[in-house]
């Protein structure tokens, strides 16, 4: 089975939120997965769609695979780096904010 990979690294969303969307399209055909992502109302859907479209383009141009036969064989979301930020509070105090990122990996295959 031929598999083609695409990675989106450092996506500006937490892995926990991105996994909710990734679970929706795992194992689906590429056309069905794109349809689900187009109508999903989540920020992560835009990022996952970008990675999926990249994987489709890789399969089409690098490996000459037919797009109609492709399905999402594997999709997983790993944690990326966390950016530490400071939120000023009252009386000279400060709280630490962590802006989380993630790495989205999509594999499509025949």
From Swiss-Prot:
GO-annotated biological processes: translation
Pfam families in alphabetical order: Ribosomal_L22 (PF00237)
Gene3D superfamilies: Ribosomal protein L22/L17
Keywords: Ribonucleoprotein, Ribosomal protein, RNA-binding, rRNA-binding
Top-level division of the source organism's lineage: Bacteria
Keyword check for Ribosomal protein: yes
Coiled-coil annotated residue ranges, if any: none
SUBUNIT field: Part of the 50S ribosomal subunit.
PANTHER family in the cross-refs: CHLOROPLAST 50S RIBOSOMAL PROTEIN L22-RELATED (PTHR13501), LARGE RIBOSOMAL SUBUNIT PROTEIN UL22M (PTHR13501:SF8)
Similarity comment: family membership: Belongs to the universal ribosomal protein uL22 family.
NCBIfam families to which the protein is assigned, alphabetical: rplV_bact
Protein name: Large ribosomal subunit protein uL22
Organism of origin: Acinetobacter baylyi (strain ATCC 33305 / BD413 / ADP1)
Gene name per UniProt: rplV
